[in-house]
Amino acid sequence: MRLSLPSIKKNILLLAAASTLFLSPSLALGAPASPDSASVASIRDKALQSDSFAYDIVEGLTTEIGPRQGGTEAEARARTWSVSKLKALGFDNVRIEEYQMPTWVRGEETASIVAPFPQKLAIAALGNSGSTGDAGLEAEIVYFPTIDDLRAAPDGSLKGKIAFVSHNMKATQDGSSYGAFGPARFVGPNIAAKKGAAAIVIRSIGTDYHRNPHTGNTNFDPGVTPIPAGALSIPDAENLERMIARGKPVRLKLKLTPKNVGMQTSGNVLAEVKGSNPELPMIVIACHLDSWDLGTGAIDDAAGCGIIGAAAKHLQSMGQPKRTVRLLWAGAEEVGIWGGRDYGEKHATEPHAFAMESDFGAGKVWGVDFRLPESASALRGQIVSALAPLGVVPRKELAGGGADVGAIIAAQKLGIIDLQQDGTKYFDLHHTPDDTIDKIDKAELRQNVAAWVATLALVANYDGELKPEAAR
């Protein structure tokens, strides 16, 4: 029988469709389906051009709450504020999960050179610093150009002295210098205490040349009595080095009077975008709600909460995703990752598949790292394609997540994507009084939201395996 041209075309289309079912496992076996690329591009571009949710969160949190150190009354007000905001944005299951934590608070802070060149220095106590007492203390400085030089000092050699540890931290796009030079703060005071030092001052872990010291947490081993520990502003640290280079003994008068106020309440704020398929393990996306007490915590980490909150809000506008997306606005990250650890303990057996975190300011996203199974290579490719118009390129490094999702990742070996932000200027502001909203670039903040929602739209609607093979 002779077929008409329309019939031939129809049969060709039917054959093509049939062959696709046989040849394409994704269609034939009902494997993961994702939103079409046009839908993802549309929501990405909408966020890039007109998102206001992220900045609104940053502005509200920094204006109406301000500094919000973990375990304090200000952090409690931040939790109340966050619940109200997340409910107003239409999220599901908004709630607070409280926990108790030991709490340290700042006191008086002064430092001055007594001899040979008397002058004041700008200083901030490090979290968990011991106290000099109200009278303060005066002692000779022993200079260590690096943390390794301090490590090499003989035991007992610092008795009655004030250790001064310097370093040469430089700005990097990926923030890698923080890991290299941060130990001066992370462990320097503990090492100095073990070697008998009466106190320690360090060059701030930062890259700016403002006379603003950078605070941050330090920790002492069990059984080690905390000694007074402070960070000098970088200009003051360099001035102190010049004094030492003149070859005369340098004496420092130091007064730091922080105190421990015992166990206090902190907590995490949780919210959700409910998924359509309860059989699929959820996604958790995180920021931290607390901040240090010197600035208003705009870049660290109100920006992160704004980014993930806005991305989840835009995701809602696409319709219900397959997977539930849980927002974790973690408490008390700065002073010991208490919120992230509490979440990991309380939700260790609740099925999760994947985690992301935003805690590196509001600089533009420039790179993307993955930790996904080989079976998710198509998803990886879709994400790379969706991010390319934003100037985001795939990197070879494996994604690692962040502090607030670290415990749940460890408990369940989750899949991870890291959206790498430009941190070139981040450590100019980190943990200083300069961490304020005027440092947020609105266009760069929107670019973050665009990258996040494009990624979330694809991951939250992917019903294949997200955990790396080694985790299963």
Annotated model-derived regions:
Residues P32-D36, V40, L48-S50, E59, ...:
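Noncatalytic luminal/extracellular "stalk/propeptide" segments of secretory-pathway proteins
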